[in-house]
Amino acid sequence: MEASFGRGEIDMALVFSERFSDKLYTGEARVQLVSDATDPNMATMQAGYAANIISSAGQEMLPPGVHAAAIVPQLKLLYNPQMKSAYNFVPGVMGLILMLICAMMTSISIVREKETGTMEVLLVSPVKPLFIILAKAVPYFVLSFVNLTTILLLSVYVLDVPVAGSLFWLVVSLLFIFVSLALGLLISTVTRTQVAAMLVSGLMLMMPTMLLSGMIFPIESMPVILQAISAVLPARWYIQAVRKLMIEGVDVSLVLMEVGILATMAVLLITVSFKKFKHRLE
């Protein structure tokens, strides 16, 4: 059951006491609800629905004329027994900030060079395109790690959000930063002004990350079309992986799917953005 929770296959499990059907007539039947509480609002809603269904079903199972005490399920909360909302939004904030710093700031920084005319100076210099890209990306890479460390310290020491799992989430964060930097570079190749770069970054990255990545709304409750759109957002897989590693403390093997998707996105985006950027320089 723990493995199923870790893989995200289930959000709630029902555990029935031994000889449940026999004890139902004597009012001694017990049911335990085991719920994933990383999202407190969703866990509360699911527990309420399940308790009502169990109570109604228990009464319907009794023969006519037989009365027994209603079944009151015992609730067990996994990963977030205190039902703190910080457990849910901290991974989302991490994904949003990294996306904004890496993608938006990188694209604006490169487009600024075009507007001021300094890009032409770089074109006539013997500097290779790769070094131009690195010179623009490295500062935001370092800044992203500084912000990541700051968020982690605030989460642990101010919000009391523990880091339950291994530090492999740092590797996942590094991968996500590469993806975000590649997105910023790609945006810079299709925009000519800083305002355009900011609008494209905001509309294509910031708003979808906030609304469709699972940061605020559970992905399972979205319409099918929005779930399909969210599948192409890097932030969705990053937030999902960080929640599993930091909050649930699952084994690294249970986030291989998310890591594989992010790695594929990183390779594709870095390849495409570098080729387009090199073509624009030439």
Describe each PLM feature range.
Residues G8, M104-S125, A137, E282:
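Transmembrane helix boundary and interhelical loop/hinge segments in multi-pass membrane proteins
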Residues P129-S201, M207-M210, S253-V259, A263, ...:
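Alpha-helical transmembrane segments and their short interhelical loops
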Residues Y79-M83, S213-L269, L281:
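Membrane-interfacial helix-loop-helix junctions in multi-pass membrane proteins
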Residues K275-E282:
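Short cytosolic juxtamembrane segments of multi-pass membrane proteins
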Residues M1-Q59:
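Extracytoplasmic loops/domains of multi-pass membrane proteins
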Residues Q59-M83:
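A cross-kingdom feature of multi-pass membrane systems that activates on extracytoplasmic/periplasmic
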Residues A86, V90-T106:
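Long, hydrophobic alpha-helical segments
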Residues S107, V111-R112, S125, S155-V163, ...:
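Short helix-capping/hinge motifs at transmembrane helix termini and TM-loop junctions
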